[in-house]
Amino acid sequence: MKIEKTALLALGAAMASGAALASNTVDKAIPNVLLILVDDLGLGDLSCQYAKDLSTPNIDRIFETGVRLDNFYANSSVSSPSRAALLTGCFPAMVGVPGVIRPSIDQNWGYFGPSAVTMPEVLKNGGYRTALIGKWHLGWESPNLPNERGFDHFHGFLADMMDDYYTHRRQGGNYMYLNDKEIDPKGHATELFTSWSVDYIKKEAKEKNPFFLYLAYNAPHSPLQPPVEWVNKVQERDKSLPVKRARLIALIEHLDYNIGKVIQSLE
């Protein structure tokens, strides 16, 4: 299925940043939608946002060809509330998520209300295939698992953050799932989510299904753990950079490269 772009929307925020890209099939059927959310990206850590020590050409392209929103507010600029607001269009506290959702009661600040209507539920009712690839962080158990909140397909991470981008563990636990089955994939999380997204897009295109894909990367959230070769490239380019900054730049540039691969698969 050949795809033509018809709309492009870019969103950015200091604590969480996202981009949405929509496309139409040649016969002008209902558009496919790709919504990308990244985690803990600083507002100034993109070259389109005037950063001088890094390059993010693929994200820049979305900003340049889409709608750029420079004056807006995040009601609660941390992980779970941002995701609840994005998926429902509501103030996060109104759907039960004023703060971060965690499994331990003494550190938990929310419960995603089962009655809240989500974007994938609405789109699914409109004939879309719906998928979440990447980070969920809106619940660990029923009735708040991705497949119960509007997603036909889930391939990703249930929890809040990874302690290691390669083992994908959080405090010793494994939260990587394919739908309701625990999995233990090998590889850097950013690259896994990209590969799974490209495969999903190709599959739905082949079957000519209109799809909504919500791609939620963990990057560039800590730990600062990009592939070593990406750190080496940054340090070779600018030997004066502090090690921590070089790692963050490498993690962001690696993320941008992978976003480019997903967008290319649409085109």
Where are these regions (language model features)?
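Formylglycine-dependent sulfatase
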Residues: 2-14, 18-267
